[in-house]
Amino acid sequence: MMGKGFEMMVASAIRAAGINPDELMEKANTLVHNLNYQLDRFGQRLDSIDSRLSVIEKALDISPAEKPDNQPELTGITFEGDNNDQ
């Protein structure tokens, strides 16, 4: 935490600049409220994306625990120069 001396210095500078401390606090509180709202919406979007990915994983029968690289196995696919067709 900041010391009382620092707080007094900041308050003095605010008053010296002609800024109303109550208006400044109101604007700061509004900013914090708006930021919290945006963070909440962002979290909801992330939850939505996560649930959609879960649906896709279930549809593809992908188990992250079984696939360490989180990739489905590709079977029946060969590439030019692939010598694994023994």
Swiss-Prot record:
Query: What is the name listed in the Swiss-Prot or TrEMBL entry for this protein?
Result: Protein P17
The region called Disordered is annotated at 63-86
According to the record's subunit comment, the protein's assembly and interactions are: Homotetramer.
Q: Which gene encodes it?
A: XVII
Briefly, what is this protein's role?
Answer: Assembly protein that acts late in phage assembly, after capsid protein folding and multimerization, and sorting of membrane proteins has occurred. The major coat protein P3 and two assembly factors (P10 and P17) are needed during the assembly of the virus particle inside the host cell, when the capsid protein multimers are capable of enclosing the host-derived membrane, containing the virus-encoded membrane-associated proteins.
